[in-house]
């Protein structure tokens, strides 16, 4: 039994030696990422302006760890009105470029600054303008457009799995409830 355990341990040890390290962020590499987090501050109380977001994107790396990103995002914010919460939802598509400006020698951590163009659709109370008390919402549903500035930290857990932490400021014009939204979130990226 001891011999079998020792052989299995040596076999597992040999599996780790054939991997090339630091083969990260090479031009042409692609990654699929999923992110989510809080928007416009952290509000856990149901009577406050609770807001969250989640999204998915595809990254394609270029030289020096820089990357092109294309994806989609959903943001929902609740506005209190009497005893109700009125949801405002934004569905946006993103296309942008993220520039790596800081990384360690072992290529484990990358800090990037990204600039993206956003376009999408915004709806208030899912299109229902008449509230239960007879009031009418004056916010109009419609298309929104703008941009986002993102600061993102990538931390490689393995050569194919990346943990993400990001902070982002979105500016969307033609929004009926506010142009700016600050987002803080985490995510996971799988390198393909």
Regions found by a protein language model. Name each.
Residues 20-71, 77, 189-191:
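Short glycine/proline- and aromatic-enriched beta-strand/turn motifs that initiate or cap beta-hairpins
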Residues 28-32, 48-54, 87-93, 109, ...:
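Residues that define the transmembrane beta-barrel architecture of outer-membrane proteins
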Residues 137, 144-151, 155:
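Acidic, glycine-rich flexible loop segments
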Residues 57-132, 161, 190-192:
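Gram-negative (and chloroplast) outer-membrane scaffold detector with strong preference
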């Amino acid at each position: 039994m001891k011999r079998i355990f020792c052989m299995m341990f040596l076999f597992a040890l040999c599996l780790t030696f054939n991997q090339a390290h630091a083969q990260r962020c090479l031009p042409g590499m692609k990654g699929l990422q999923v992110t989510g987090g809080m928007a416009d501050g952290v509000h856990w109380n149901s009577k406050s302006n609770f807001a969250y977001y989640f999204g998915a994107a595809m990254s394609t790396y270029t030289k020096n760890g820089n990357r092109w990103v294309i994806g989609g995002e959903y943001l929902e914010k609740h506005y209190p009105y009497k005893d109700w919460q009125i949801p405002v939802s934004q569905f946006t598509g993103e296309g942008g470029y993220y520039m790596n400006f800081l990384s360690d020698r072992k290529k484990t951590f990358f800090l990037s600054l990204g600039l993206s163009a956003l376009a999408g659709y915004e709806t208030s109370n899912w299109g229902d303008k008449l509230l239960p008390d007879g009031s009418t919402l004056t916010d109009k549903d419609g298309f929104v457009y703008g941009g986002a500035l993102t600061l993102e930290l990538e931390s490689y857990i393995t050569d194919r799995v990346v943990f993400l932490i990001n902070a982002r400021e979105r500016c969307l014009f033609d929004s009926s409830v506010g142009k700016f939204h600050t987002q803080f979130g985490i995510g996971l990226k799988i390198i393909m």
